[in-house]
UniProtKB/Swiss-Prot annotation:
The gene is dcn-1. The keyword Translocase does not apply. One of its GO terms (biological process) is establishment of mitotic spindle localization. GO terms for molecular function: cullin family protein binding; ubiquitin binding; ubiquitin conjugating enzyme binding; ubiquitin-like protein binding. It is found in: Nucleus. Keywords: Nucleus, Ubl conjugation pathway. One of its GO terms (cellular component) is nucleus. SUPFAM superfamilies: UBA-like. Interacts with the cullin cul-3. Interacts with ubiquitin via its UBA-like domain. Interacts with ned-8/nedd8. Residues 134-345 form the DCUN1 domain. It holds the Pfam family UBA_4. This is Defective in cullin neddylation protein 1. Residues 83-120 form the UBA-like domain.
Length: 367
C-alpha cells in the first residue's frame, strides 16, 4: 500500500504536451479530487476543470473500458479529502484491485460500509475493470487436499479434512469465521463441503488459495459489526445449517452453541435468556419424569428452538433495548420470547413500561 503514499506532485508542466488520457468516470473523479486538494494546499482556487485534472502516477490503475464502468449509473462526482485512506482501507479489507475498489467506492458515494456491502453482494459487478484471477484447477486441487478417506464421504470434505482446513486457516472450531466460511460456501451439512460448494464459494470470493480465502473471510468477519443485515443473514443461515435434516427445530444445546458463536461474549440479557431456557428445560423434565419415569424422561428433549423463535430472537436481542422497555407485548413475538420478557419483569426487576408510551424498537447494535 506504500504506492498510495507516493508523491502527489505530478508533472503539471508537461500536462499540455501529453496525449489525452482515456479515463473512466470514477478515475476522472479521483484525479480531479486529488488535483483540487493539491490546489488548495498551494492556495490555488480558480483553476478550471481542464487545469485541475492531473495524472495520478502512484496508483497502479489497470486500463478499464467504458463498457465495464457503465454498470454503475450512480458514480459519485465528489470524493472526500481523505479518499486515499478510504481507498486504502477498502483494498486492505477486500483484497480487491484498486480499479475495482475505486468503482465500488464511487458507486457508494465513498461510504465504505455501503461499498463493502455492494462488493460482497456482487464482487464481479466491475469485473471488466480487472481480469478474473481465480484458477479453477487450483481450487479443485486445493479441495482434493482436504478430502480424507477416513471420513468415508467419497468426494467430499468431511470432519477430518475440515479439521486440517481450519488449522491451515488458523481458526478454532468455535470461531465465528468458521460459520462465516460455511455461510459463504452455502454448506448444507455441518463439517462438510461438497466440491460444488467449495468451488462456488471460492469463485464468489475470487480466491484460489488458503491465504486468499483467509483474507476474505477475515474481512467479512470484520465487517459484520457495521453490517447488521449480513449478521442477520448469517443467523438465518445457521438455523438450517445447525439442525438435523429430520428435525423441524433446533436442539437447545446446539442453539446455545451457535448463539455464542454468532454473538460472542454474552451480555447480561443473553445470559438471562439462556438461564431462562435451561429453567424451562428443568421444569419440562420434572413433568416428564412424573409421567414417564426418570429413565424415559431423559430420552426426551423437551425444549426446542423453532425457526420463528430463532429468526425473531435476532431482532429481539440486537434491535431491542437491553432493559426491554421498548418491548411491544402486542407484537407478533413467539410465545417463548413473551414468556422470557414476563420472567424478566416479574423476577429480575426489569421495568414495566407504560403501554401508552411504548415505542417501536429502536435500532442499536448488540456488538
Amino acid at each position: 500500500m506504500n504506492r498510495l503514499k507516493a508523491d502527489q506532485k505530478t508533472k503539471v508542466g508537461k500536462r499540455k504536451q501529453d496525449p489525452p488520457e482515456t479515463l473512466s468516470e470514477a478515475e476522472y473523479d479521483v484525479k480531479k479530487c486529488r488535483a483540487q486538494n493539491n490546489a488548495n494546499l498551494v492556495g490555488v482556487s480558480n483553476m478550471t476543470s481542464s487545469q485541475t485534472v492531473m495524472p495520478i502516477t502512484h496508483l497502479s490503475y489497470a486500463s478499464s473500458s467504458s463498457q465495464g464502468l457503465a454498470q454503475s449509473s450512480i458514480l459519485s462526482k465528489n470524493c472526500p479529502k481523505n479518499y486515499e485512506n478510504i481507498l486504502r482501507q477498502f483494498v486492505q479489507w477486500t483484497q480487491a484491485t484498486e480499479p475495482v475498489s475505486l468503482n465500488f467506492l464511487a458507486k457508494a458515494n465513498w461510504n465504505i460500509e455501503y461499498a463493502m456491502t455492494l462488493y460482497y453482494d456482487n464482487p464481479n459487478l466491475f469485473s471488466s475493470s480487472a481480469p478474473a484471477t481465480v484458477d479453477q484447477s487450483k481450487t479443485i486441487q486445493l479441495f482434493t487436499q482436504y478430502v480424507d478417506k477416513r471420513d468415508g464421504l467419497g468426494e467430499r470434505i468431511g470432519p477430518h479434512g475440515m479439521q486440517r482446513l481450519l488449522i491451515d486457516l488458523g481458526y478454532e472450531p468455535i470461531d465465528r469465521r468458521v460459520l462465516i466460511l460455511a455461510w459463504v460456501f452455502k454448506a448444507e451439512t455441518q463439517c462438510e463441503f461438497s466440491l460444488q460448494e467449495f468451488t462456488n464459494g471460492m469463485a464468489s470470493l475470487q480466491v484460489d488459495s488458503i491465504q486468499g480465502l483467509k483474507q476474505k473471510i477475515d474481512a467479512l468477519d470484520a465487517g459484520m459489526k457495521a453490517d447488521l443485515t449480513k449478521t442477520r443473514d448469517l443467523c438465518i443461515f445457521t438455523f438450517n445449517y445447525g439442525k438435523s435434516a429430520a428435525s423441524r427445530s433446533l436442539d437447545l444445546e446446539m442453539a446455545i452453541c451457535y448463539w455464542d458463536v454468532i454473538f460472542g461474549a454474552r451480555k447480561p440479557l443473553m445470559s438471562q435468556w439462556i438461564d431462562f431456557l435451561y429453567g424451562q428445560e428443568r421444569m419440562a423434565y420434572a413433568r416428564l419424569e412424573e409421567e414417564l419415569g426418570p429413565t424415559n424422561a431423559k430420552k426426551v428433549k423437551s425444549v426446542w428452538i423453532t425457526r420463528d423463535t430463532w429468526n425473531l430472537f435476532w431482532d429481539f436481542i440486537v434491535l431491542g433495548k437491553e432493559d426491554l422497555s421498548d418491548y411491544d407485548e402486542e407484537g407478533a413475538w413467539p410465545v417463548l420470547i413473551d414468556q422470557f420478557v414476563d420472567h424478566c419483569r416479574e423476577n429480575l426487576n426489569y421495568p414495566k413500561p407504560l403501554r401508552e408510551n411504548s415505542n417501536a424498537m429502536e435500532h442499536q447494535s448488540y456488538y
